[in-house]
Amino acid sequence: MEKEKKGARELDLLDIVQFVAPGTPLRAGIENVLRANTGGLIVVGYNDKVKSVVDGGFHINSAFSPAHLYELAKMDGAIILSDSGQKILYANTQLMPDATIHSSETGMRHRTAERVAKQTGCLIIAISERRNVITLYQGNRRYTLKDIGFILTKANQAIQTLEKYKTILDHAISALSALEFEELVTFGDVLSVLHRYEMVLRIKNEINMYIKELGTEGHLIRLQVNELITDMEQEAALFIKDYVKEKIKDPYVLLKQLQDMSSFELLDDSILYKLLGYPASTNIDEYVYTRGYRLLHKIPRLPMPIVENVVEAFGVLDRIMEADVQDLDEVEGIGEVRAKKIKKGLKRLQEKHYIDRQL
């Protein structure tokens, strides 16, 4: 598998947390060690750098099981697993990292874990004997796994926040859609909706972290998120395609740049203008016209390639609305039936958003 080829040492934080999430054999073994109050040190991955810090121990090379991990953790030394975590390679080893590597930890086990992680780049799992805490180290990163009850509480709070922000976003999008049909959208409206999309996506990403950490316990949270914001990334990407200055093939690149921004950058209009390809001095009250990707995509059973062809042919939503059935029929991939469907679909959306705006 691709993930096994990469090795645990190359995984990002979400993957690392999922690697030891409830429901995995590794987490089951770690929980056994926690309950026994023996503590432990586990290295995931074995390469030349790991070899250079390992001393002693004995070769196991057997399939991983929670019971084996529990028994081997009774000994003082570290346990070394394969990159995939599916094999126990060595047990009762002594780890001797470079003592000059800075460590902010105080306990011997955690100090060793931090130094080995920095020196080797591998995932190191330190199980505290007294505090019943699981700490993950990889490179310069440190992450303490939290109690499942605590994570569930935080996840449910985040779900409630997501619901509120999603409601605000829905109102903003509905108002924007009405303005799009009336050709009254300003750059201020665009930036406002862009902010709201990003806030919803950030909350979703935070909840995804909780879901990964919860493992099998996060199933209901995942269902709630999926029900709340299905296809949110796609809608945000189409919104960007509607308003970016120059046409782009992959709006997800800009969406990723948006999500990588700090909270301060997100509040800076000039940075958002630059992201969309406009001058930083753009007037917030200046009118801007949608291409129509997002609204056309809302018409049932209208494939994205057809949406692309329509926008390519007419340029902006206003011209699409002005086009008659014959004009639409001339677009590649659109026959008379589909042309009528587009006209009726846009008319229905226009009426819906007009009514929503009056409520």
Swiss-Prot record:
Its EC number is 2.7.7.85. It catalyses: 2 ATP = 3',3'-c-di-AMP + 2 diphosphate. Gene3D superfamilies: 5' to 3' exonuclease, C-terminal subdomain, DNA integrity scanning linker region, DNA integrity scanning protein, DisA, N-terminal domain. It comes from the Bacteria. Disulfide bonds: none annotated. InterPro entries: DisA, DisA_sf, DNA_integrity_DisA_N_sf, DNA_integrity_scan_DisA_link, DNA_integrity_scan_DisA_N, DNA_integrity_scanning_protein, RuvA_2-like. GO terms for molecular function: adenylate cyclase activity; ATP binding; diadenylate cyclase activity; DNA binding. Its cofactor is Mg(2+). GO terms for biological process: DNA repair. Belongs to the DisA family. Participates in a DNA-damage check-point that is active prior to asymmetric division when DNA is damaged. DisA forms globular foci that rapidly scan along the chromosomes during sporulation, searching for lesions. When a lesion is present, DisA pauses at the lesion site. This triggers a cellular response that culminates in a temporary block in sporulation initiation. Homooctamer. NCBIfam families: PRK13482.1. This is DNA integrity scanning protein DisA. It comes from Bacillus pumilus (strain SAFR-032).
